[in-house]
């Protein structure tokens, strides 16, 4: 069963990244029971009034407790806000859950990172925007590597999630592992469009990492290599 869930999750992940319009109809009772099942059913039905009633009496422990196959209610809400279910009301359900205490940075074993990291890799910014509306900080860091979630945008097919974070006042010079900035990471990930967006919004090309390298010095070194190879 775990292998099946992993396969389904991988397919869902791929389709979210591609912005597809139709998905698998997973059922709430396949994963949840008790109070979590009531919440999951409201999410599945897209019933925000009913969800509000459930959330008014739920504690954060229940809201964030992994159910069968490590499924969480927030990831369940994401699954129910994709394909033809990508509606404003269903995106607001994601916002409602985060406002109520669902943790978008909670590591999710069956997906590439936490819900926030997962949706940062998508080719649309609507899911991360829903979390930001719920209170997620645009400068949030993952709980495993302490890496700013802005770096996850470099795995996306375009700059949509990056632009959303910036619109919500993300620090474009925030430093991650080895004190590398988003600009340096975008360079190492060969993301010219992301670099253009970062520079247009004030990213500092002179900021140095632990190796005393800056974006500008790395670019200059690459130009020098090219000049020498052409000599």
Model-derived regions, located:
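Ankyrin repeat domain, specifically the short helix-to-loop turn at the C-terminus of the second helix
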Residues: 55-62, 93-103, 129-137, 163-171, ...
């Amino acid at each position: 069963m775990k292998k099946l869930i992993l396969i389904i999750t991988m397919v869902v992940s791929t389709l979210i990244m591609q912005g597809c319009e139709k998905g698998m109809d997973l059922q709430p009772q396949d994963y949840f029971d008790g109070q979590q099942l009531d919440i999951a059913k409201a999410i599945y039905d897209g019933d925000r009034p009913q969800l509000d009633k459930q959330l008014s009496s739920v504690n954060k422990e229940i809201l964030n407790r992994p159910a069968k196959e490590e499924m969480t209610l927030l990831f369940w809400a994401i699954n129910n806000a994709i394909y033809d279910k990508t509606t404003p009301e269903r995106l607001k359900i994601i916002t409602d859950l985060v406002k109520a205490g669902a943790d978008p940075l909670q590591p999710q074993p069956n997906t590439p990172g936490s819900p926030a990291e997962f949706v940062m890799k998508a080719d649309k910014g609507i899911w991360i925007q829903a979390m930001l509306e719920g209170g997620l900080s645009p400068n949030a860091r993952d709980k495993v590597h302490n890496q700013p979630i802005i770096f996850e945008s470099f795995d996306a097919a375009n700059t949509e999630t990056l632009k959303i974070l910036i619109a919500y006042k993300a620090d474009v010079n925030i430093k991650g592992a080895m004190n590398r900035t988003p600009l340096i990471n975008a360079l190492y990930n060969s993301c010219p469009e992301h670099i253009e967006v970062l520079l247009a919004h004030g990213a500092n090309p002179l900021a140095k990492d632990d190796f005393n390298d800056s974006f500008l010095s790395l670019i200059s070194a690459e130009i020098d290599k090219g000049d020498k190879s052409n000599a």
